[in-house]
């Protein structure tokens, strides 16, 4: 296996074309930031040292980088512009730490699909040919914005020309620089020490370091086997296009594993989601975070699940659930909102316009419609009538409601927590339950009906 001694991740850019007050590298891509994705791919190669270069909103980016890898060396780029200067700063810092030798990987952090396998292949090619440096390239149908790879007649790298410095013939070249390189550490140290800003942008270009590398040894080229993995994101149009292409791949991957995805164009599945064979995902579904869907479950249409476990045979229709567990054969929806912290047991129901938060619903219990259940435990085989509310908040504390098994809660009940309702209880419609109810009881509020005959509303009386 190819050895990686140092990795330098470039995360200094503002990303002005994103037109955002969020640094480009901290934008989300299918549940993770660009920077997180790149750092995860690099960290899987187990470099001895990993440096992250920051500049725009430096502390914000540095804080994110440390959260992804607490051992990362944070390097702040000064006011001198360019990727070459960014690498200079990293090299100087690593040299001060006496940690700069062997093979160095340089990676831009605006390629959210850059994968460990591609980086490993680059390092293997670099090592196999004993190169001074190796450039990762790709051939794109639309190379706009990328530096062009200019080869000599023998196919070797002649130079890399940035878009704004390229002439008409060079702009026709479709092989591009991906801004990913492998360098010998000593070669890189020499190369970056001689960089200048003699170009149209007045910046230190890292690509100029390859000229020095060519004087020392061979500069190789490794073409990426997967163009999608090395596509960068410069604006939100590119972000949307890359997200769509990635998501189609994800959906197709699950379909090949035995999952039915009715419409991949309208189904979004993040990378950490797990789905078992024979699950069915209907259009308009968004599966996020650590969501896991078991066999024979049916999700959708128009459903969002975030960090939610769906057990075998459960059905979730036109609903949203977050940080919840839905038991075997549970039926959720339509228009159910499960806020964080719910556990619904086997064959339970949370029906139309039901909201739950930190609720435990035991096997066979049903909350069919128009109810709020929060900070509550409802035991097995209980039915909760429509329009029922657990009034859990007293203005300071969230209080608990306990409802026993085989209970029939009437329509329009309000349970004022903290309160406990025992087993086998029946409550009358419209009851306000403020005090504990023992087992095997009937409870109802004495709300007398008053009828005023020949009544006229105010607007009628004023005529």
Residues of each region from the PLM?
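Conserved core of the sugar-phosphate nucleotidyltransferase
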Residues: 59, 114-200, 207, 217-218
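Short catalytic helix/loop segments, enriched in acidic residues and glycine
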Residues: 21-38
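Catalytic metal- and UDP-sugar-binding loop of GT-A-like glycosyltransferases, i.e.
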Residues: 10, 29, 107
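Acidic, glycine-rich loop-and-beta core segments that form the ion-binding/anion-interacting portion
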Residues: 274-342
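Glycine-rich hexapeptide-repeat left-handed beta-helix
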Residues: 309, 316-463
């Amino acid at each position: 296996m190819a050895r990686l001694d140092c990795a330098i991740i470039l995360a200094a850019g503002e990303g002005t074309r994103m037109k955002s007050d969020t640094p480009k590298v901290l934008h989300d891509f299918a549940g993770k930031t660009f920077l997180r994705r790149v750092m995860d791919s690099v960290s899987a190669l187990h470099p001895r040292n990993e440096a992250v270069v920051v500049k725009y909103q430096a502390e914000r980016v540095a804080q994110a980088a440390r959260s992804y890898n607490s051992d990362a060396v944070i390097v702040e780029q000064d006011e001198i512009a360019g990727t070459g200067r960014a690498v200079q700063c990293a090299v100087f810092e690593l040299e001060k730490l006496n940690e700069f030798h062997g093979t160095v990987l340089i990676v831009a952090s605006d390629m959210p699909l850059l994968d460990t396998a591609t980086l490993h292949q680059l390092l293997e090619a670099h090592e196999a040919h004993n190169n001074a440096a190796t450039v990762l390239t790709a051939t794109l149908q639309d190379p706009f914005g990328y530096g062009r790879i200019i080869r000599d007649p023998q196919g070797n790298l002649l130079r890399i020309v940035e878009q704004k410095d390229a002439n008409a013939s060079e702009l026709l070249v479709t092989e591009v620089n991906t801004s990913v390189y492998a360098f010998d550490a000593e070669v890189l140290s020499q190369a970056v020490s001689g960089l200048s800003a003699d170009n149209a942008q007045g910046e230190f270009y890292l690509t100029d370091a390859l000229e020095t590398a060519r004087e020392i040894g061979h500069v190789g080229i490794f073409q990426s086997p997967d163009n999608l993995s090395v596509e960068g994101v410069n604006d939100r149009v590119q972000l949307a296009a890359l997200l769509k292409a990635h998501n189609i791949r994800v959906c197709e991957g699950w379909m090949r594993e035995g999952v039915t995805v009715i419409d991949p164009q309208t189904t979004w599945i993040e990378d950490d989601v797990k789905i078992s064979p024979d699950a069915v995902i209907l259009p308009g579904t968004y599966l996020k975070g650590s969501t896991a869907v078991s066999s024979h479950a049916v999700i959708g249409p128009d459903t969002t699940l975030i960090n939610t476990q769906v057990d075998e045979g459960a059905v979730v229709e036109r609903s949203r659930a977050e940080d919840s567990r839905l038991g075997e054969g549970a039926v959720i929806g339509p228009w159910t909102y499960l806020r964080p912290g719910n556990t619904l047991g086997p064959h339970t129901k949370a029906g139309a316009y039901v909201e739950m938060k930190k609720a435990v619903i035991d096997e066979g219990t049903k909350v069919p419609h128009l109810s709020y259940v929060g900070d509550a435990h409802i035991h097995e085989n209980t039915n909760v009538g429509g329009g029922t509310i657990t009034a859990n908040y007293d203005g300071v504390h969230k209080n608990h409601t306990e409802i026993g098994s085989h209970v029939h809660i009437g329509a329009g009940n309000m349970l004022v927590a903290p309160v406990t309702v025992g087993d086998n209880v029946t409550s009358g419609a419209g009851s306000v339950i403020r005090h504990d109810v023992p087992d095997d009881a009937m409870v109802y509020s004495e709300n007398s009906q008053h009828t005023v005959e020949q009544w006229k509303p105010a607007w009628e009386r004023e005529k």
